[in-house]
Amino acid sequence: MNKPKQILRLRKRAEFLALRNGEKRRGPLFLLEVRERTEEESQTAKIGEKPRAGFTVTKKNGNAVIRNRIRRRLREAVRCHAGRDMAPSTDYVIVAREQALTAPFSRLTEELSRRIKAKGERRGDGKRRTERPESGPVNGK
């Protein structure tokens, strides 16, 4: 069996906030925020090319026991399966939804791998790729 690739963890608030401006990939089980690090950021943190992952489970998902269970499932899915798909010098934040607890583990890992591999679905600046057409005059006026 292949040894899983080492994935470092995001732990500081500033690291999580930096990803708010990154690309967002939405799914039914979680939201994935992705951002490539600059060389300067990698050297400052002394982490090199390794990918980093952070996990967020809000209180909306339940009490501490439920939130920790969701976080453990996501960590294991990244460690065993999805970590192989992570790009070097990239940070990922996984914001869990309630369904991440009840979904089969195989679906969780498949969805996570698919979202990690998908590139450029959104611009990351909160804007849509195509602008909506301007509204014309109402009733010909």
UniProtKB/Swiss-Prot annotation:
Protein family: Belongs to the RnpA family.
Composition bias, Basic and acidic residues: 114-134
This protein's encoding gene: rnpA
Superkingdom of the organism of origin: Bacteria
Listed EC numbers: 3.1.26.5
Segments of this protein annotated with the region Disordered: 114-141
Name the UniProt record assigns to this protein: Ribonuclease P protein component
GO biological process: one example: tRNA 5'-leader removal
Keywords from the UniProt entry: Endonuclease, Hydrolase, Nuclease, RNA-binding, tRNA processing
One family name in Pfam for this protein: Ribonuclease_P
Reaction(s) this enzyme catalyzes, per UniProt: Endonucleolytic cleavage of RNA, removing 5'-extranucleotides from tRNA precursor
Organism whose genome encodes this protein: Brucella anthropi (strain ATCC 49188 / DSM 6882 / CCUG 24695 / JCM 21032 / LMG 3331 / NBRC 15819 / NCTC 12168 / Alc 37) (Ochrobactrum anthropi)
One Gene Ontology term, aspect cellular component: ribonuclease P complex
Molecular function (Gene Ontology), one example: ribonuclease P activity
HAMAP family reported in the protein's UniProt record: RNase_P
Subunit: Consists of a catalytic RNA component (M1 or rnpB) and a protein subunit.
Reported function: RNaseP catalyzes the removal of the 5'-leader sequence from pre-tRNA to produce the mature 5'-terminus. It can also cleave other RNA substrates such as 4.5S RNA. The protein component plays an auxiliary but essential role in vivo by binding to the 5'-leader sequence and broadening the substrate specificity of the ribozyme.
